[in-house]
Amino acid sequence: MTVSREEISTILDDALFLPVKLYSLKVNQRPNHSLIEVVLDNLEHPYGSVSLLECEQVSRKLKEELERISPDLDFTLKVSSAGAERKLHLPEDIDRFRGIPVRLVFRSGESEKNQEGIFRIVNRDGDQVFLEKFQKGKKSAVKKQTTLNLKDILKGNLYVSI
């Protein structure tokens, strides 16, 4: 017995409560077993972190509903937070995480190789993203500003400085 990704997504729509939303869903179906991985996001937390209690509540609701609609389903369920160094969903996360350090991989007209850097998102105007180079612990230093076109940003993650 299997359950589809769409069925799980529908159950999650009912199980989730704002400010918690679905970040990603992976369903790996095997002939006799399913691995269901749910990753959550908290829209009100500065880094999107979800509490253990929130993960537990969603896990419990999803498990109960899966057992109700498909009692013979053999599955492993993993519910977690997207994490402090989560992958950015572009372009919407550019606005959401303004002011927070991010690690970006981007194309630069000056080089054939992809570039990488740690920046703070200052602002976005259409496809232009205004950044300043992140300098750990240097509050009064002159901030080096740069501008990237959104299409040149290949990937990004939140960056946690310890």
From Swiss-Prot:
Q: What family does the database annotate? A: Belongs to the RimP family.
| Source organism, top-level taxon | Bacteria
Protein's GO biological process: ribosomal small subunit assembly; translation
State the name under which the record lists this protein. Answer: Ribosome maturation factor RimP
Against InterPro entries, the record matches this protein to:
Ribosome_maturation_RimP, RimP_N, RimP_N_sf
Q: Where in the cell is it found?
A: Cytoplasm
Functionally, this protein is described as follows: Required for maturation of 30S ribosomal subunits.
GO CC terms for this protein? cytosol
Q: Which NCBIfam families is this protein grouped with?
A: PRK14635.1
What are the alphabetically sorted keywords of the record? Cytoplasm, Ribosome biogenesis
